[in-house]
């Protein structure tokens, strides 16, 4: 099970890392008009499709065609953690080496958007305080790691749950008992 988790986690993580490292290039090509959320979550879903493949591979090749919901979920969770960790690591490289002003630009864009919206003064002030709080928290590397995991890991967990529900397969006790002549009349 560990080898299966490692292989499919690395495949998923390499895909996510390649996406993260290419996002600054894509933003420059599209002159900032790239909807990063849609593209980002689409890339996460594609990368985490390896959770389904890895869980099915574990069930069919290593577990005699059977897997419980719990086993399938643990396989998916392991793949998610490895893939998410590579995503976080690549974001840290991108952020600290190539985009150290990312949070300043992102906060400025959020503030401008909030000021252009038609919010009441109280709501606007709450939004601005929230943006400034997030920006100051992002100065701490631990918070950068936590925020980045919170961005990617929930997607992996949801896909792990869905994969476990679809792929769970318990042995049929009646059929195996009859086939092994263990049936009592």
Regions found by a protein language model. Give the residues of each.
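Transmembrane alpha-helical insertion/packing segments
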Residues: 1-58
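Alpha-helical transmembrane segments of multi-pass membrane proteins
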Residues: 3, 7-11, 15, 74-83, ...
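Alpha-helical transmembrane segments of multipass membrane proteins
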Residues: 15-23, 47-51, 83-87, 91, ...
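Membrane-helix interface/capping segments
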Residues: 55-71
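Functional transmembrane-helix hotspots
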Residues: 89-117
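Short membrane-interface loop/juxtamembrane segments of multi-pass integral membrane proteins
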Residues: 113-139
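Individual transmembrane alpha-helix segments
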Residues: 131-154
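Juxtamembrane interface at the cytosolic side of transmembrane helices
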Residues: 161-185
